[in-house]
Amino acid sequence: MADAPSHFPMHPCPWCEGFALYRAYHDQEWGVPLRDDRALFELLILEGAQAGLSWATVLKKRAHYREVFDGFVPERIARYDEAKVAALLADPGIIRNRAKVAAAIQNARSFLALTAGGQTFSDFLWQFVGGQPIRNQWTSLAGIPAKTPESDAMSKALKRAGFKFVGSTICYAFMQASGMVNDHLVSCPRHSSIHTNFHFS
């Protein structure tokens, strides 16, 4: 697909402006294709933790999440007991929601069951976009959907596999963040740079 015309004014996606942490995340991470199983698992857990809150809240707490959730290693999280859950729910450095903490543990167990047969988590997730990022051509934030048929399919498959906090809207936000779709506006320099540097088909 064509890039924005050379005369088109270029500026970052409006949602990242006015908050330094958002801007750094937008410029360095959001929309960059992720293929690493552990990184994808981490992102899925954090997207679920964000439900009903702002992503800024999660970004502010992400480093602490990584510390108390053992680097988001599924094998470790799957073994969490009630004492660990109680410690997490008493920790102001994370989002203290019992259902979300329980979902992280359940999702770790579902991750292990899903990958036990040899399929990678990455391959399982990327199948919903045919293994390659979808490069969209949005000109305004208003045009970007909250969910798509691809996120609907991912959500249904994850739920069948036992995952929690994986509704279609959460899955689409996950797909945007993990680079399964390039939803930077065409007026954003990252739209073309991600395409160039990560070899979209």
Q: Where are the regions a protein language model picked out?
A:
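HhH-family (HhH-GPD) DNA N-glycosylase catalytic core used in base-excision repair
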Residues: 1-201
